[in-house]
Amino acid sequence: MAKILTVFYSLKGETIAPGMKIVNLEKGHTAVAAEFIQKAVGGDIFEIETVKTYMEDHMKMIYEAKEELEKGIYPELRNYPDIDEYDTIILGYPNWWNTIPTPVFNFLEHYDWSGKRIIPFVTSGGSGLGKSVDDIRKICVGAEILDGGAFLGHEVENSEQEISAWAKKCVQAQTNP
């Protein structure tokens, strides 16, 4: 049986809800989805955390993130898990400017992914995976990268059954090729 690590990057605080309404989240959408996934498939869970704190004002934060992406600035992370013992990494993140957030770029570039399976999932306002899976494939040479799953951020809290079923299907597909 494969050893699974669910890794996620998520922001809490201000975000945009449908209708361009600003809401304040105690826990980010991706964190909620990651917890559902870990509960459904087992294994361990790890949150990617940056040393710096992003701006609390959501609109300012998204432009800060865009500038990081355009300049290739990847914020320093608090720590990195030892992934050697894991066969499968379920990787969750919000869609930032049609790709993975810069902290996730940093995380991915830290490892040799040879022989690993990566199952990406994204939370977004409706833009889906964007080009994130292509970007993951470029970084994680030697890994098998599944196409991934996309979940609407504002619906995550009420989507445990859907998210869990998706995760179980992905993990089952790897154990029964």
Where are the regions a protein language model picked out?
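N-terminal beta1-alpha1-beta2 submodule of the flavodoxin-like/Rossmannoid cofactor-binding fold
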Residues: 1-88, 98-99, 105, 161-177
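Short beta-strand elements in bilobed, periplasmic/extracellular small-molecule ligand-binding domains
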Residues: 44-46, 143-151
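Short, conserved loop/helix-junction motifs that constitute active-site signature segments
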Residues: 83-84, 109-115, 139-140
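Short, flexible active-site recognition loops that position polar ligands and cofactors
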Residues: 148-161
